[in-house]
Each structure stands twice: as structure tokens, then as C-alpha cells.
Amino acid sequence: MRHLKKGKKFHRLAGPRRAFLRNLANDLVRAGKVTTTEARAKAIRPMVEHLVTIGKKQTLAARRTLLSRMQNEKVAMKVYEELAPRYSSRVGGFLRITKSAKSRKRDGSRLSTIEFV
């Protein structure tokens, strides 16, 4: 039974799923805004918010944690140097998910836009 299990599987094994979510999070940090399905947006929201919270600590350990989690130095430094100071006075809720009226043509999935507030 699947009681108290968090997160979606997205029809992937654990390793490819982690890589998929990490790449989507990297794209969001790099661009500031990503249009994707509603389920994917909901899946990366807590992950990215936690990364911004880690970056707000402004310590060497926080910087190394970001580097290990994101595995992209430019993106990790953007979180550490740009996003964390921008949200220093904010406790949480760094991201906004806006549901779109459009759906994908090929499979009818509902699209959403996830962006930084």
C-alpha cells in the first residue's frame, strides 16, 4: 500500500526521476519562469523553495549543499548570490504556480506556469 508516500513517480525509476526534477529546477532558476504540466510544477515547487531557503543561510556549507544538489555551478551561484538576498526578508512562498487555460494538444495535460514571485 502507498500510505504516507510523498511525491509523484512520473513513470520513472528513482535515478532518472531525480535527474528529471533537478533539470527542471535548474531551468526554472536559470529562466525565472517555466511552463510545464501542473503535476511537474507542483513537484518542483518544494524542492526549489528549499534550495532558496538553504541559500539564505549564506555559509560555506550552504554553498556546497547547493552545488551538490543542483550539480550546475552557474545555477547554484545564481541561487546563492541573486535569489537568496532577494528573498532574505521573506519566510517562504518564493514561487507562484499559475494554472493556464490551455492544455497540451497531444495528450490534453493541463499546463501551468511556475515562476518566482
Region locations from a protein language model:
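Ribosome large-subunit tunnel/peptidyl-transferase-proximal elements
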Residues: 1-88, 102-117
